[in-house]
Amino acid sequence: MNINLTLIGQSIAFAIFVWFCVKYVWPPITAAMEARQKKIADGLSAADRASLDLELAQEKATKELQKAKEEAAALIDQANKRAAQIVEASKEDARKEGEKLIEQARAEIQQERVQARDALRAEVATLAVAGAEKILETSVDAKAHSEMLEKLAAEL
Amino acid sequence: MAADTPVEYIKHHLTNLTYGKLPEGYERADGSVVQEATWTFARTGQEATDMGFMAIHVDTLGWSIAMGILFLGLFRFVANRVTEGTPSGLQNLIEMTFEFVQGIVRDVFHGKNPLIAPLALTIFVWILLMNILKLIPIDYIPSIAHALGLEYFKIVPTTDPNATFGMSIGVFLLILFYSFKVKGVSGFSKELAFNPFNHWIMIPFNLLLEILALIIKPISLALRLFGNMYAGEVVFILIALLPLWIQWTLNVPWAIFHILVIPLQAFIFTVLTVVYLSAAHEDH
């Protein structure tokens, strides 16, 4: 336990070790550690940002979806209305067409009736003459009686 | 071993391998007389004492420098391969030490000085490594040294006050340097003269108190570390004197206890160094 030159030797060794540590050991390792800390911090903040972005995107997507839904509903509504209109118009058309057809048919029937009546009228004179001949057993002068017959036919 | 009685055994284990200068006409242990002043290894504890200041504890210096080189070599090795990515096992260990020391400095030191943290790291790891040597059974290395012809051999540098005072004096010089640098000569003198009693009448008393407090710092640093390590060493030596079959019941618990003491003493020395230097940086 003697105090001697070892004391000075130890002090010198201590100084050299401290100097070496300050110069060659401390800086590279702390630099690497700080760089890693920064990397981790950056990564974390990036993750935060990403999650925020995701939230925004989700919100936007929900909005878009909502908008699309609304648009689709409007379209369907419109289409339904249009379809109803078309159906209505078709119905109207069909009805008009039907009426027209019926009208036509009626006219034709009327025409035929007139024609038949005229034909009948024409024949009635002959038939009446024939009938009268039979009854009278004589020939009737057609020319003499035609006036009367025509009057008769007109009464039919 | 060159020890027949317990007292000799203990004395032997507490004597350093000393290389020093014997004065002219000195009568050595074997009766021979030194013709002129010579540098030689001390053969007995008495010779080592008589060498006075002009002597070197080869074992203390050798082992402490070896531990310092081990520390710096290991850390420099890692520093060369350091990666910002996922650290490997060894880098992890080194970084844990760094973070530990950075934590101490951050908590205790309030100034800004790039020297403090590496200084604390050096002190902590170096003392830790020197203290750890204590866990090597006390007779292993001295026996080998003895076989190589070296009479005395102490492997734990921190059980030698020269080693602990060497460090604490280094710290003391730094305290003085930064006190003068930060506070200036007048500021530092004022601090010594007007604390704790701020009155001119108290200046002599203040000076006495403050200078004493200043000088006590390195002494307490060195003696605390030395005392703890030395006492532990003595207990190990005493245990080694017991019969072989009973030794393990005592030296195993004592060694386990030293697993606590070894880093604790390194930690205390480091923290106090940072505290003292922090005070040196505080300008009132």
UniProtKB/Swiss-Prot annotation, chain A:
Q: Does the keyword Transmembrane helix apply?
A: yes
Location within or outside the cell: Cell inner membrane
Q: Name one GO cellular component term.
A: proton-transporting ATP synthase complex
Q: SUPFAM superfamilies, from UniProt?
A: F1F0 ATP synthase subunit B, membrane domain
Q: TM spans, by residue?
A: 12-32
MF terms from GO for this chain are: proton-transporting ATP synthase activity, rotational mechanism; proton-transporting ATPase activity, rotational mechanism
Q: Which domain of life is it from?
A: Bacteria
InterPro entries linked: ATP_synth_B-like_membr_sf (IPR028987), ATP_synth_b/b'su_bac/chlpt (IPR002146), ATP_synth_F0_bsu_bac (IPR005864), ATP_synthase_B_chain (IPR050059)
Bridged cysteine pairs (disulfide): none
Q: State how it assembles.
A: F-type ATPases have 2 components, F(1) - the catalytic core - and F(0) - the membrane proton channel. F(1) has five subunits: alpha(3), beta(3), gamma(1), delta(1), epsilon(1). F(0) has three main subunits: a(1), b(2) and c(10-14). The alpha and beta chains form an alternating ring which encloses part of the gamma chain. F(1) is attached to F(0) by a central stalk formed by the gamma and epsilon chains, while a peripheral stalk is formed by the delta and b chains.
Protein task: F(1)F(0) ATP synthase produces ATP from ADP in the presence of a proton or sodium gradient. F-type ATPases consist of two structural domains, F(1) containing the extramembraneous catalytic core and F(0) containing the membrane proton channel, linked together by a central stalk and a peripheral stalk. During catalysis, ATP synthesis in the catalytic domain of F(1) is coupled via a rotary mechanism of the central stalk subunits to proton translocation. Component of the F(0) channel, it forms part of the peripheral stalk, linking F(1) to F(0).
Regarding protein family, the annotation reads: Belongs to the ATPase B chain family.
Question: Can you name this protein?
Answer: ATP synthase subunit b
Provide the species name.
Answer: Marinobacter nauticus (strain ATCC 700491 / DSM 11845 / VT8) (Marinobacter aquaeolei)
Gene symbol here is: atpF
Swiss-Prot record, chain B:
Q: How does it sit in the membrane?
A: Multi-pass membrane protein
Query: Which CDD domains does the entry mention?
Result: ATP-synt_Fo_a_6
Question: Which residue ranges traverse the bilayer?
Answer: 55-75, 116-136, 165-185, 196-216, 234-254, 255-275
Is Transmembrane helix set as a keyword in this record?
yes
Cell inner membrane listed as a keyword: yes
Q: Name one Pfam family in it.
A: ATP-synt_A
Q: Which InterPro entries match?
A: ATP_syn_F0_a_bact/chloroplast (IPR045082), ATP_synth_F0_asu (IPR000568), ATP_synth_F0_asu_AS (IPR023011), F0_ATP_A_sf (IPR035908)
- GO CC, alphabetical: plasma membrane; proton-transporting ATP synthase complex
Q: Which GO terms describe its molecular function?
A: proton-transporting ATP synthase activity, rotational mechanism
Keywords of this entry: ATP synthesis, Cell inner membrane, Cell membrane, CF(0), Hydrogen ion transport, Ion transport, Membrane, Transmembrane, Transmembrane helix, Transport
List localization entries: Cell inner membrane
Name a biological process GO annotation: proton motive force-driven plasma membrane ATP synthesis
As for family, the record states: Belongs to the ATPase A chain family.
Indicate the quaternary assembly: F-type ATPases have 2 components, CF(1) - the catalytic core - and CF(0) - the membrane proton channel. CF(1) has five subunits: alpha(3), beta(3), gamma(1), delta(1), epsilon(1). CF(0) has three main subunits: a(1), b(2) and c(9-12). The alpha and beta chains form an alternating ring which encloses part of the gamma chain. CF(1) is attached to CF(0) by a central stalk formed by the gamma and epsilon chains, while a peripheral stalk is formed by the delta and b chains.
- State the function annotated in the UniProt record: Key component of the proton channel; it plays a direct role in the translocation of protons across the membrane.
Q: What is this protein called?
A: ATP synthase subunit a
